[in-house]
Amino acid sequence: ETLAPRSSDTTLAMEGLAMTGAWVDRELGLVSIIALEMGGSSDICQLMKPGDPVVLMGPTGMPTETPGDQTVILVGGGLGNAVLFSIGQALRAAGSKVLYFAGYKSLADRYHVDNIQAASDMVIWCCDEAPGFEPNRPQDRTFVGNIVEAMQAYASHNLGHVGIPFNDADRLIAIGSDRMMAAVAHARHGSLKNHFKEGHVAIGSINSPMQCMMKEICAQCLQRHIDPNTGEDTVVFSCFNQDQQLDH
């Protein structure tokens, strides 16, 4: 509270926040995190100034699996791209090929373009706002519309050359809003079903409220799972492992 800003007689002290990690520079000793302003303590982050001390705990959760010698499709919506570009870079460093669908609501939302390009062999830039993004690399494509529509257009060869076919994909990782990930999960069994090979792994990063950040303590992050084959209903602590099977 000593360093917290004050407004009239109110101390604007922040509670603990669950943050999105973006990147790490080990040589310079830097950690980049992203705060999503959603009211309360997260809004106070905008009052921080360069040089203010910050206490970080973590990382919590589990590392995302980044196997080598596979073909992986990354599907990122908005803030999810801040996480996916580091995952994509790790996958490529391990020897995997990466097809990246990066989706945004508006043209002003895109950031870290160089990092996303470094995380992918091919990027499909998706934007709800026309005229869409101009690709920087010859192998990349652009699409005006939502990310599932972009995937359908790509799979149907409506975006030109298909550099990495869907049926080559061993793994799909989706990070974004609940609605976006649900739409991707539904499309895999609907309009895109014939384009994916049997047995591919599909992972979604669970969005849930966080509180203790100590793994399986407070149960604030409990999420319901329903097995699509048996109908069995279970719960998981998403703070322990944020990456779960997309179909559950």
Model segments located where?
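Local cysteine-cluster metal-coordination motifs and their immediate loop/turn environment
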Residues: 83, 178-179, 208-244
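Short glycine/proline-enriched turns and hinge-like loops at secondary-structure junctions
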Residues: 12-14, 66-68, 215-216, 231-233
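FNR/FR-type flavoprotein reductase catalytic core
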Residues: 40-211
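Short, charged beta-turn/beta-strand-edge "cap" motif at the junction between a beta-strand
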Residues: 2-7, 58-63, 228
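Ferredoxin-reductase
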Residues: 1-50
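Generic structural signal for buried aliphatic residues
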Residues: 1-3, 53-56, 221
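Short, solvent-exposed loop/turn segments that connect beta-strands within catalytic domains
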Residues: 9-12, 28-29, 196-197, 228-233
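Extracellular/mature segments of secreted proteins
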Residues: 247-248
